[in-house]
UniProtKB/Swiss-Prot annotation:
Signal peptide: none annotated. One of its GO terms (molecular function) is 3-deoxy-manno-octulosonate cytidylyltransferase activity. The keyword Cell division does not apply. Activates KDO (a required 8-carbon sugar) for incorporation into bacterial lipopolysaccharide in Gram-negative bacteria. This is 3-deoxy-manno-octulosonate cytidylyltransferase. InterPro entries: Cytidylyl_trans, KdsB, Nucleotide-diphossugar_trans. The gene is kdsB. Belongs to the KdsB family. Its EC number is 2.7.7.38. Pathway: Nucleotide-sugar biosynthesis; CMP-3-deoxy-D-manno-octulosonate biosynthesis; CMP-3-deoxy-D-manno-octulosonate from 3-deoxy-D-manno-octulosonate and CTP: step 1/1; Bacterial outer membrane biogenesis; lipopolysaccharide biosynthesis. GO terms for biological process: CMP-keto-3-deoxy-D-manno-octulosonic acid biosynthetic process; lipopolysaccharide biosynthetic process.
Length: 254
């Protein structure tokens, strides 16, 4: 029997490129409702929206979602997740999945996969997903986070830089992906053991996390194991810009 898990969807109103992003309309529904709908299709026993904004809270209550108003001063999404897990009274060995509030096309199967992977790997406190990189432009794009793992699928590191750097191959040609190097893009969905979250918050950011702006590096810095599996379904891009929003509107608007 699969271990039960809770989905938490962080949703902040502030956004540099798209203010009020969670409330942007997509084919008659606010974006946060679209994300909530996808999460509800997963095997999660509970789906909770975590927001620091009264407008988002009211919208969620309007379409029947369970939602919590959190503190506004959290340093990261994981810090916000810890507050929610504590307020919900989740057991230390419970699993919580963090689904980003700007992923209205997230496949429910990936939510189930990342939760099941964590349950199957007791040596890890976090599980996440990745997919192959097929274009050299993605490898050199700092917005595409790369991940390298060991033989057991545990993360060695994450970086916005090309990882690993194929020295000899790139000395000859930087316009093609080197053969024999399994480059992978990190997909930003996480499952956590609740007991780990308090440690994560207590540690505070480390210099490596700050340099890359990747909070998962805080866990690796402290020796925490992160299991990384290849996603079973394609993860369609989320919404970061007005152009992304129009693309998703076309997909969901028919």
């Amino acid at each position: 029997m699969t271990q039960a898990f809770t989905v938490v969807i962080p949703a902040r109103y502030a956004s540099t490129r798209l203010p009020g992003k969670p409330l942007q309309d997509i084919a008659g529904q606010p974006m946060i409702q679209r994300v909530w709908n996808q999460a509800r299709k997963s095997a999660a026993s509970r789906v909770v929206v975590a927001t620091d904004d009264e407008r988002i809270l009211a919208a969620c209550q309007g379409f029947g979602a369970e939602a919590l108003l959190t503190r506004a001063e959290h340093n990261s999404g994981t810090d916000r997740l810890e507050e929610v897990a504590s307020r919900l009274g989740l057991a230390s060995d419970a699993i919580v999945v963090n689904v980003q509030g700007d992923e209205p096309l997230i496949p429910p199967a990936l939510i189930d996969q990342v939760a099941a992977n964590l349950a199957a790997h007791p040596e890890a406190a976090i599980a996440t997903l990745a997919e192959p990189i097929h274009e050299v432009s993605a490898l050199f794009n700092p917005n595409v986070v790369k991940v390298a793992t060991d033989i057991d699928g545990l993360a060695l590191t994450f970086s916005r830089a090309p990882l690993p750097w194929a020295r000899d191959a790139f000395a000859r040609d930087r316009d093609s992906l080197p053969e024999g190097v399994p480059y992978r893009r990190h997909i930003g969905i996480y499952a956590y053991r609740v007991g780990f979250l308090a440690d994560f918050v207590a540690w505070g950011p480390c210099w490596l996390e700050n340099a890359e702006s990747l909070e998962q590096l805080r866990a690796l810095w402290h020796g925490v194991r992160i299991h990384v599996a290849d996603a079973r379904e394609n993860m369609l891009p989320g919404v970061d810009t007005p152009e992304d929003l129009e693309r998703v509107r076309r997909v969901l608007g028919g």
